[in-house]
């Protein structure tokens, strides 16, 4: 996506690039038993071990070296993984009482990949949702956008909210500041066409601040894909209409970020 010729830099590339990927899975559970089964299913499918494997693959895609991994499954539900990464290969630092070199500390502090999961449900409406928040923060030439396609395909979300920003600056050999080192007009530039065709998308970008924001909502709606433990054949015509309305309203509220009146 970047045809800009390489600029010779003075020293290390100090740009910090942050990709925030929030995905939502929505489901209708008819009974409390189905709801508990859905949450248990989500907890099993997106446990800390599987999330760790996803993040390891993200690190491979962006060319980062894993320094440390911390992971945890929570009770009653949810999981999180934090991975520290570096742009260069891992170098063994000799044991010494003196503080570590500053460059090593910066490498550890500023490049990381995290994921947290949040299953939840409506107290009485039958709607259950699952949210996963993934943050990929890199310092240097590594671009987290390279992993976006893989993340989208890993979660197959009903709704995605994606943010990307670039902070700091680096200098060329003449001292001229560079506040971004690649071409981008929209996060959609980095989403393959076959995926873009599946989603309705809205962009809110602030170009002068290097802030890019894209919301995505699945276009095709098949009720059977949102029912857990049964199919629409088990529902009456009225139940199909009411359940469809509930699910679409839930998706619209998440997509637009606001509560909506019944019948919207």
Swiss-Prot record:
<comment type="subunit">
    <text>Heterooctamer of four alpha and four beta chains arranged as a tetramer of alpha/beta heterodimers.</text>
</comment>
<keyword id="KW-0670">Pyruvate</keyword>
<comment type="similarity">
    <text>Belongs to the prokaryotic AdoMetDC family. Type 2 subfamily.</text>
</comment>
<comment type="function">
    <text>Catalyzes the decarboxylation of S-adenosylmethionine to S-adenosylmethioninamine (dcAdoMet), the propylamine donor required for the synthesis of the polyamines spermine and spermidine from the diamine putrescine.</text>
</comment>
<comment type="pathway">
    <text>Amine and polyamine biosynthesis; S-adenosylmethioninamine biosynthesis; S-adenosylmethioninamine from S-adenosyl-L-methionine: step 1/1.</text>
</comment>
<feature type="site" description="Cleavage (non-hydrolytic); by autolysis">
    <location>
        <begin position="110"/>
        <end position="111"/>
    </location>
</feature>
<dbReference type="InterPro" id="IPR016067">
    <property type="entry name" value="S-AdoMet_deCO2ase_core"/>
</dbReference>
<keyword id="KW-0456">Lyase</keyword>
<protein>
    <recommendedName>
        <fullName>S-adenosylmethionine decarboxylase proenzyme</fullName>
        <ecNumber>4.1.1.50</ecNumber>
    </recommendedName>
</protein>
<feature type="modified residue" description="Pyruvic acid (Ser); by autocatalysis">
    <location>
        <position position="111"/>
    </location>
</feature>
<keyword id="KW-0745">Spermidine biosynthesis</keyword>
<feature type="active site" description="Schiff-base intermediate with substrate; via pyruvic acid">
    <location>
        <position position="111"/>
    </location>
</feature>
<keyword id="KW-0620">Polyamine biosynthesis</keyword>
<keyword id="KW-0865">Zymogen</keyword>
<dbReference type="GO" id="GO:0004014">
    <property type="term" value="F:adenosylmethionine decarboxylase activity"/>
</dbReference>
<dbReference type="GO" id="GO:0005829">
    <property type="term" value="C:cytosol"/>
</dbReference>
<keyword id="KW-0210">Decarboxylase</keyword>
<keyword id="KW-0068">Autocatalytic cleavage</keyword>
<dbReference type="InterPro" id="IPR003826">
    <property type="entry name" value="AdoMetDC_fam_prok"/>
</dbReference>
<dbReference type="GO" id="GO:0008295">
    <property type="term" value="P:spermidine biosynthetic process"/>
</dbReference>
<keyword id="KW-0949">S-adenosyl-L-methionine</keyword>
<feature type="active site" description="Proton acceptor; for processing activity">
    <location>
        <position position="116"/>
    </location>
</feature>
<dbReference type="InterPro" id="IPR009165">
    <property type="entry name" value="S-AdoMet_deCO2ase_bac"/>
</dbReference>
<keyword id="KW-0704">Schiff base</keyword>
<dbReference type="Pfam" id="PF02675">
    <property type="entry name" value="AdoMet_dc"/>
</dbReference>
<feature type="active site" description="Proton donor; for catalytic activity">
    <location>
        <position position="139"/>
    </location>
</feature>
């Amino acid at each position: 996506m970047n045809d800009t010729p390489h600029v010779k830099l003075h020293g290390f590339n100090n740009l910090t690039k942050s990709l925030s990927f929030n995905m939502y899975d929505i489901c209708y559970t008819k009974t409390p038993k189905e709801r508990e089964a859905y949450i248990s299913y989500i907890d099993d499918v997106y446990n800390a071990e599987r999330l760790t494997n996803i993040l390891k693959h993200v690190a491979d895609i962006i060319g980062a070296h894993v320094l440390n991994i911390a992971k945890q499954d929570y009770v009653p539900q949810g999981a999180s993984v934090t991975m520290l990464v570096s742009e260069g290969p891992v170098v063994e630092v000799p044991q010494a009482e003196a503080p570590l070199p500053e460059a090593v500390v910066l490498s550890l502090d500023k490049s990381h990949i995290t994921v947290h999961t949040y299953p939840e449900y409506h107290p009485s409406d039958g709607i259950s949702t699952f949210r996963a928040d993934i943050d990929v923060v890199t310092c240097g030439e590594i671009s987290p956008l390279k992993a976006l396609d893989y993340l989208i395909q890993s979660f197959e979300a009903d709704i995605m909210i994606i943010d990307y920003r670039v902070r700091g600056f680096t200098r060329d050999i003449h001292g001229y500041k560079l506040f971004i080192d690649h071409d981008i007009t929209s996060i959609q530039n980095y989403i393959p066409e076959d995926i873009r065709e599946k989603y309705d998308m809205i962009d809110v970008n602030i170009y002068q601040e290097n802030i890019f924001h894209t919301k995505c909502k699945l276009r095709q709606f098949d009720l059977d894909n949102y029912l857990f433990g049964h199919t629409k054949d088990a529902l009456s015509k009225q139940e199909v209409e009411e359940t469809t309305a509930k699910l679409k309203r839930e998706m619209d509220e998440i997509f637009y970020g606001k509560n909506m009146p019944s019948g919207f």
